[in-house]
């Protein structure tokens, strides 16, 4: 089987995508890991033979739905596991409705989930498609296992005594993009149309993030 794994943010996704690709290749599959634009061009031009396109998310934006449909029309199958996971959000209900839809799941041959909370919520919210939703875990989480300690190595500056790590990544306050661009991107992608309360939550979150970051 030909498998194409799309990578959007290499620092976040490349290692886990290569792990997935290595395991698939060991089973005899032909795997390409590349940026989305290159894969899309290869498929539209007919250069890449039909197979599985493994997407980083099933966000129901119009352009993504159209892209996946074009792939399906050329004989490709769509699979996905959401790279973002929703681990920093209490509950999974809002995430399941903002990052998925009946249409994007119906286009997919398989939807993989990080753990019990997301798979149970997805199966309940999208009960018509419950048989194609699987609890597999994420290859990103697999890389946290002790098996890969040597792969990551230990920084020379790492403390020798027990320590508490406090993440300084406040996703909205110190994002690489200004907050207004984040809002614009979400609006274009239809997040606020699908979940009218999300705009209020984002405004609340960015206020809290700025307080934590610059207090």
Language-model regions, residue ranges each:
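Active-site and donor-binding regions of nucleotide-sugar-utilizing enzymes
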Residues: 2-154, 166-174
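Conserved catalytic-core segment of nucleotide-activated headgroup transferases in glycan assembly
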Residues: 147-215
